[in-house]
């Protein structure tokens, strides 16, 4: 007689979840950060706000961003003037854009990941889709299933409105799905488009202006599975453990609210301080089982919320400058793409590690950490084990 325990054992994978492939995509429209303040104040009819424009220029200069990619072109904004105003009712116009474009950009990234994985897409058993750009029913997960031609029986999970920590969340979920379902191959997609947050400047809402200086569009996709097929699947990283926590005394530090005017963004000044003050506790809890306490012995992937967060984390933990190289590179080339950022950094790291002839995907090191930071303040901590390049 077969018992429930027998069935349970048979359902479980043997090895840890691994990242088997990564793909990324951006809209074609590239925006130069050095000329963006002029463009932004012109397109939003705000050129008379000279003092505010100077303030915005300083924000852009300090952002450490060289360029960003944006679905919103000048043509689209001219056709939708309400999106350019500060706090004008515009949710319908924004929704009409993102419900189409978010799955489309996700498809581009997913197609690249599936190609690298090298297996037929019919072998994808689960889909996790994550976006903070718009909400719809059926969701972007359903739309992507149709766009990619996945099996109708693919098991879908749609994550809306999680914000910047969610790149860590999707890895945590994919790990659990892969390890508890033998043979599972999980397609994870994060797709973000700033059409929900773009708006004109205001003297009274400077945190909104911070978002206008930092946010960019991008999608990233990964394939996660346990027990890779030898000679067929080439794992890049193992997902060793994953944790989530809400930081103490951080209520209201980062908020986003979906309103008639789109997604509004609110930020307290001390977000970098709150994160840097608490990050060592998360690291200690994650790496204590491995007996690791030298944070410079790890490879690092941290959500680049902004340069101040990275600077303070570096300072607090005494990290060498090169530790956040991959993170800073992605911030500089793409801006803050919310949930997609950490997956872009994972991709950048494994590619540069191979190009530099290093022995592992994690800059030649064995163990690494991936951090997601976002509304809550919520922190996701993922322990990674690199594999040979």
Swiss-Prot record:
Assigned keywords, A-Z: Acyltransferase, Flavonoid biosynthesis, Transferase
GO molecular function per UniProt: naringenin-chalcone synthase activity
Active site annotation, chain numbering: 164
Pathway(s) annotated for this protein in UniProt: Secondary metabolite biosynthesis; flavonoid biosynthesis
InterPro entries xrefs: Chalcone/stilbene_synt_C, Chalcone/stilbene_synt_N, Chalcone/stilbene_synthase_AS, Polyketide_synthase_type-III, Thiolase-like
Short name of any one Pfam family annotated for the protein: Chal_sti_synt_C
Catalytic reactions of this protein: (E)-4-coumaroyl-CoA + 3 malonyl-CoA + 3 H(+) = 2',4,4',6'-tetrahydroxychalcone + 3 CO2 + 4 CoA
GO biological process: flavonoid biosynthetic process; polyketide biosynthetic process
EC number, UniProt record: 2.3.1.74
Annotated CDD domains: CHS_like (cd00831)
Keyword match Signal: no
Physiological role: The primary product of this enzyme is 4,2',4',6'-tetrahydroxychalcone (also termed naringenin-chalcone or chalcone) which can under specific conditions spontaneously isomerize into naringenin.
Family membership: Belongs to the thiolase-like superfamily. Chalcone/stilbene synthases family.
Protein name: Chalcone synthase 1
Species of origin: Camellia sinensis
Gene of this entry: CHS1
